[in-house]
Amino acid sequence: MKINNVLTAKFIKRPNRFVAYVYLNNEEVKVHVPNTGRCREILIPDTTVVLREGTNPNRKTKYDLIAAYKNDKLINIDSQVPNAVVEEALKNKKIQPLVKFNNIKREQTFGNSRFDFKLWDDSNNKYYLEVKGVTLEDKGNCMFPDAPTERGTKHILELIEIKESHMGAGILFLVQLSGAKTFSPHKEMDKKFSEALTLAHKKGVDIFCYDCNVGEDYIEIKDPVEIIL
């Protein structure tokens, strides 16, 4: 996935979930952060960050803060990216367990939840897929969530309902960096989410995790990552 109109800056501070300040061309500039997670281990003062220039002249901020360097590793933090990357991967048959599904629709409802994807094959076998972006990483070990997520737990419980309704159901964790070794739920951050994910696995819901190739102006799905529940 190509990302246009990118440039680098230095991170200063993030006063709230939606706004940050950076040094750009020797000026302090207010930018939008397209990620409501905490990202505390990534957005550290003087860190080099990647900005994307917006195309809407009426927006309040000119730039989005979409990625940051953690040591020499670039981490994409844009919460809109995972669905786009996964859609591209589904269409290009890059997710091996799901290659039989030729039909793909975004943002489809089941029960009281809207899921990221509804897939079906030529025999009309249906499959609902939820995608979660992962940015929390330590020495190659990745975790989700980095903040409590009632909505995430609700999605998992409804994926179990889908599976029990004799349809396919899965959740895909997309690690928005390269070189991930393992993935596990962040039990200390959100015990209910972790318990729901373990229950879903026992009930037959598919759990996938992939990392990405990440550059300042691109991101694409890469390799499966070992899952530890």
Curated annotation (Swiss-Prot):
HAMAP family: SfsA. One of its GO terms (molecular function) is DNA binding. This is Sugar fermentation stimulation protein homolog. Transmembrane segments: none annotated. NCBIfam families: sfsA. Belongs to the SfsA family. CDD domains: SfsA-like_bacterial (cd22359).
